[in-house]
Amino acid sequence: MILRRLLLAGSLLLASLAAAKKEGPKITATKFDHEPRHLFYFEDTDTVVFQHKYDAHISTDAGQSWSVIKGPDDGMVGKVKSIYPHPHDRKKAYVFGQSRTHWVTEDAGKSWRAFKIEQDIPRSGNPLAFHGTDSDKLILHTIDCSGFVCDMPALYTTDGFKSHKTLTKSQHGCNWAITTPEFGTQADLPEKIDNRVFCIFSGLHAPMGRNKRLLYSDNFFEDDKGFEVPLNNGRPVSDVVRLAGVKKFLVAAAKSPRTTEMTLYVTDDATRWHQAMFDGHKLENDAYTVLESTNYSIQVGVKTTGGFNPMSALYTSNSEGIYFTRNAEHVNSNHLGYIDFEKIAGIQGIFLINTVSNWEEIDNNHQRKKKVVSQISFDDGRTFHDIKAGDKKLHLHSVAQLHNSGRVFSSPAPGVVMGVGNVGDHLKEYDEGDLYVSNDAGITWSKALEDAHKYEFGDLGSVLVAVYDEGRTNKVSYSIDHGKHWETAELPHKIRARVLTTTPDSTSLKFVLIGTSKSGSGVEHSVIGIDFSNLHERKCGKDDFERWPARLNEKNEPDCLMGHKQFYSRRKAGSECFIGSEFKDPVPELERCKCTEEDFECDFNFVRSKDRKDCVPARALPVPEGQCKKPDDKYTGSSGFRLIPGNDCVKDGGIELDKPKERPCSDAAKEPVSGEIDVTKHFFSANKPAEYYYLERPVLSKDKDETIVMLTDKLEVFITRDHGKTWKETLEGKHVVKLWPHTYINDAMYFITGEKRVIVTKNRGDSFREFETKLLPNRDRLPVLAFHPDPERSDWLIWTGADNCGRGGDCHSVAHYSTDGGDEWHTLMRYVGRCEFIGKERSRKTDELIFCAQHENENPKNRHLRLVSSDSWFKDKTVHYNNILDFRTMAEFIIVAARSEKDSLKVGASIDGKTFADAEFPANFDVKVQQAYTVLDSSTHSVWLHVTVHNVEDHQYGSIIKSNSNGTSYVLSLNNVNRNNADYVDFEKMEGLEGVALVNVVANVDEVQKGAAKQLRTMITHNDGAEWAYIRPPAKDADGRAYSCSPGKKGTEECGLHLHSFTERPDYRDTFSSPSAVGLMLAVGNVGDHLTLKSEGDTFITRDGGIEWHSVKKGNYIWEYGDQGSIIVIVPEAKPTKALFYTLDEGKTWTEFAFSEVEMLILDISTVPSDTSRNFLLWGKEVGSGSKPGFATVNIDFSGLKERSKECVLKEDKPEADDYYLWEPKHPLLEDNCLFGHITRYHRKKPEASCYNGGDFERLHNVSTNCECTRQDYECDYNFERQSDGSCALVPGHQPLDPKRICTEDSKAIEYFEPTGYRRIPLTTCEGGLKLDGFKAFPCPNKEKEFEKKHPRLHGAGLFFAIVLPIAAAGVVGYYVYTRWDGKFGRIRLGESGSSGDWLSRDSPLIAIPIAIIAGTVAVLSALPLLAASLWRSARGWTPIGRSSRPYSSRGAFAARRGDYVGVVEDEDELLGAEDFEEDEEV
């Protein structure tokens, strides 16, 4: 048994003492100066191993004597870091060394073999993942750090570390499909499953390890990157956090985004997965524990209350691990997740639990002390009974309060159970308990010994051993009659017992006791061997055994479970003998029973009825083909029951609940599809909605409601659960003035009143709770509520209120915090500007990190703020910046804007919330402090800022600057970008697609500075702001007529597509794109030289990420995406209408649909934020004849439409086999689909497929191997600016950043690079190819030797021959070829279709290679003065080669693109592979 609770570690073997009392056990003590760790037995042997400081010690006589394991060549001495036994192979164990040498034994410690790896072993946790049936197969998790960056490679071996290979370079945990010996025992698993491996990886492009993915491979990821596991109805799931084996099941746990929910998925064949369904309960993050389970069910404890007094509910699954039934509530647990639940070893169906009797008091007051009571079940949790000692209730300390290693109550000894506890109303403290024993598997109990003791079982229960556990003792107690009578034996000296243990199967007569004792001023540790082998000479005979029934029913008769009765041959309590069958586990005798109701469970697709007597359909049932042609038909199907797999009851003469039965077709498939769109209109008396919010269900949630909370302009609160088909008014008379949704949890909504009272719902409006705040809402227009970003801290709140605001008062804002959802408030800080929690994901260490802006000198009249932080609720604080304007927490950065000493804008950035670095702005970019700034985005590993350059009302515009990957060094991305009076900017990132953004720029800057109206033009970037271009307009409008201007292949200043953007939207949630409709954008605009009035615009769509646009409707429409873009609805904006238009094929065709008999003015159209629903909601008013007063909502439901009635089929391993295809975004000027250095592939529904996408899923299929770098992977470096030809040049009068800074900032740096004017775009992952940065390296000061080792150079003769010999050889070959080649240069022969095929022909490698070398050399030499960094690097070295496919066919084609995306110098087309001549030049 592996130790769970040991205290100290160390090494120094001091002494060995032996003592033996006549007719008593043999006792031997060995002293150590540090306590042993990791003690375990090799099963079925007397061999024990433990770690003592940095040595491993071994005993082959059950602890009587000990020696140090030396290993091969004494290599293990003083080098041991950790020890792990193999859980499925009793002879194997693994010792990990302090360096990279480790050892394995395959003969229970008799010999050891060394093996080496090149990575380090993580400091915590077991690094090994074991195969369930092949002990030679293991996965080893390692860590490999370089500087501050660490990878987590996983290695694997199939021969027990005689050899090993890399499984994956980085992971968050890998495991075998077959994790336990029981897995797959009831299924015919294909051979490939034996090698199947599952790994959790970081999400593609997800920051900070978010959106983890579960992938599998059957060939150790050698030929592929693995396939995502189809956990959810055949589709992958993001944010998988754990994978574990439980008996015959594999269980995967996934987090639900923007909720505290956790979802479990279960499989019993590593292929087909099902979502675990819990009976009316949802799992919370880190709030469940998979308990000891059986071969036919999973036991799970689900935390129901947290805080200082956690409790859990106990659930048991059906045999497939899918449907879970609640067996017990209010089960006692601790803050570590340990739950008071334990099965009786070796006996099916019996387990003990502790429940909390005063759970209602605990719910109302978490400070109350729990009253814990013990119960026992003899029928697998169907019923529970009090534990009795005589006629009194007995309560026992269990798993939540461990006091020994191994199991708490029982061992493989049949029926013998012990525990420490007390009789009475509830469980008392441990030291108030006594030792109790049961001889009949827990039915009856009696007191064994006074006081609390540690205890163990030996010789299958023939010997019980106990040692006093309330203080020091020099005695050990033992019983040989099942605990009826006890004797004592003297220990060599007094000890404080720490661990008492024996062989895992409890068949031995030998025990090991570990204890501590005082030695002078220190503590010494004793490992004591206790041997009862010679206590009796007689071995038990046949008459000494009884046929003992393992379970008894209420009539005291042998009971049936899983179709059989269970009996053991057990030594009689009064027999004075020892069994002596060492290392032979007890084998039960099974007697089959007739089938009863208890032998059946609900069939698949069925769940228990509320009265638990029947099984009712859980969902629409599948119908045999050809049946149920009419709704009132019947068909023969499942009865709802099935025999529990593994149950061996006899049906003959018993109950048969699984006989097929006739069912009504109403139980079967859902209602026939109407083929039509459903419309539901609802009227409100108010004039308009003041605000509304969707409380969207996470994709993994079993509930599918579509909830909206709305506040009208009459301050009425309405809630709908069905997307606006029905509305219900709530919170009448509560004077709600503002809705405040939880920023991170979708289920929660806060209702702000005009008083100190706040109302909250955490279950989407099912129930409400009120709490009082200390102050009224603040008057400084600050957020009144701030939330903690970690889901498990969703009750942590910051309230910013107004204090001392009476007449003549010193009115200011004060922040209070609560950690219990508003029940108790504590002052956080006075005179604040704004406060925010910083989650542990960013701060890495603490949940309590908070940032606040506070008035300097706590003077509200002082407009100067300072940025402060604290991780102790501001008992202590750190001042980061003085004189700030404001701060923002973005996706990857914390950004602060402050005034510099020169009254200019100064920006600081932090990634971890601890260290800030000042940003360096581009040259000639001195921004006055009164100029506005806007943080635009920080989701692509860089910060985007818009800084206003011209700040006259209605005439504002400014520049977009973009940072490097740590947010400190900014470069100019684009000038003259439009901004409005509210500081919003015409800038929008395309959702779901990296690097694409649109802006509107002011075209007439000079006129605007003189007071003229702005003329706007739209520009787009496809490489994250490194380059911008005008949008190429479509050739024809929606009516098929050509536009008045035609730009050709690119947009120009005179002719482009210009779009109305962010600053003109009444609702900023209405965006061009949708995160779930990858590649699609809709917009209103016009074709011409600038943007005209919105009323004059038309509606356009793009399907390829903004490269090609199409005019879909004349006029101005508002739009919404549904079902992830498979349905798009548009409605005329600001124009009365009775009809909408929808498309099912991404805008290629449109269908008109009338939704109202009366004309309506539609103000907005909405759907769930993820755009995954087939329901839409129109918000508007009836106008004209027959109109009703007030405003109305109109639900448009497409789920009945025939073309959207069947769910699409997606297979990750065959992604284009059914209803989907793989789409690759691209850059408009690159021939291949490399974007940001890689090819990205997304799942997109085939437009012609008649099906619906359903719930949101991970659309990103994979990211291919990195591409070679091109110009589009670079942007201009700090103090460099883009020239008219696209190149980057130093700003006159300024210098680049000092490249030597890296040497002082990173102590491990050995070199720095000469600035080239270019830097890599933070998003890019390209490798090789065009290298425009870091071209020439120099050694850091005092790192010359390391630099020389990294960059060895040729000297002397070696350098001479390296230069001269290739030139001489080329000359000889060239002369020989010239004189003998039949093609000879300049020679033209008519009628020849190709080369002769001779070895000296033009296509011969002998000719082609020298020509390529010469041509490449000329090209490079001619380019060196212009662009020294323009070299192409291949995988073979530094050969100057081009890309596999040329982006341009001629110099003319290259030149034709100048002025848009070109970012190279004049002659770089030759480097990029342009042909030597124009296509129409004469030869």
Swiss-Prot record:
Segments on the Lumenal face: 21-1356, 1427-1483
Biological process terms in GO annotation: Golgi to endosome transport; Golgi to vacuole transport; protein targeting to vacuole
Assigned keywords, A-Z: Glycoprotein, Golgi apparatus, Membrane, Protein transport, Receptor, Repeat, Signal, Transmembrane, Transmembrane helix, Transport
Name of the protein in its database record: Vacuolar protein sorting/targeting protein 10
Main localization, broad class: Golgi
Cytoplasmic compartment residues: 1378-1405
Main function: Functions as a sorting receptor in the Golgi compartment required for the intracellular sorting and delivery of soluble vacuolar proteins, like carboxypeptidase Y (CPY) and proteinase A. Executes multiple rounds of sorting by cycling between the late Golgi and a prevacuolar endosome-like compartment.
Signal peptide interval: 1-20
Membrane topology field: Multi-pass membrane protein
Keyword Transcription among UniProt keywords: no
